[in-house]
Curated annotation (Swiss-Prot):
Residues 109-122 have a biased composition (Basic residues). It comes from the Bacteria. Keywords: Ribonucleoprotein, Ribosomal protein. The gene is rpsP. This is Small ribosomal subunit protein bS16. NCBIfam families: S16. Belongs to the bacterial ribosomal protein bS16 family. Residues 106-135 are annotated as: Disordered. GO terms for cellular component: cytoplasm; small ribosomal subunit. InterPro entries: Ribosomal_bS16 (IPR000307), Ribosomal_bS16_CS (IPR020592), Ribosomal_bS16_dom_sf (IPR023803). It comes from Chlorobium phaeobacteroides (strain DSM 266 / SMG 266 / 2430). HAMAP family: Ribosomal_bS16.
């Protein structure tokens, strides 16, 4: 059975992962069939590059992505695109749906940033009040 999984590279405390297609019996950093992407979790925001055509090929031949790789693939929109193709949508429909999907994802990221900044500001205000009450 072929798995699509992460192979750790990089150095100590600075991981960089290759997204590879590998036999399920091989060790994590052992033999693999093909490199199909990269993932840098330490970059802000996380950097993910995936060869979409090769991921689609391996998944169509029966390769199973691990949970982490599945979430990375989902974040690039590839799973949604593959689902639309499987449903029999035309190329124009797929392109328009993917543009809508990208817009929704951008909007969600912006909302998350706003919420995060509000939480930071509230935390700073609470710390300021606590410091003022102690003095």
């Amino acid at each position: 059975m072929v798995k699509i999984r992460l192979k750790r590279t990089g150095r100590k405390k600075l991981p960089i992962y290759q997204i590879v297609a590998a036999d399920a019996r091989s060790p994590r950093d052992g033999k693999f069939l093909e490199v199909i992407g990269h993932y840098q979790p330490t970059a802000k925001p996380h950097a993910v590059t995936i060869k979409k055509d090769r991921v689609a090929y391996w998944m169509q031949t029966g390769a199973q992505p691990t949970d982490t790789v599945r979430s990375l693939i989902r974040s690039t929109g590839l799973l949604y695109e593959m689902r639309l193709k499987k449903m029999g949508r035309s190329e124009e429909e797929i392109v328009s749906e993917m543009e809508k999907w990208q817009a929704r994802q951008t909007e969600r990221r912006q909302k998350r940033l706003v919420v995060k900044s509000r939480r930071r500001q509230a935390k700073k205000e609470a710390e300021g009040k606590a410091a003022g009450a102690e003095a």
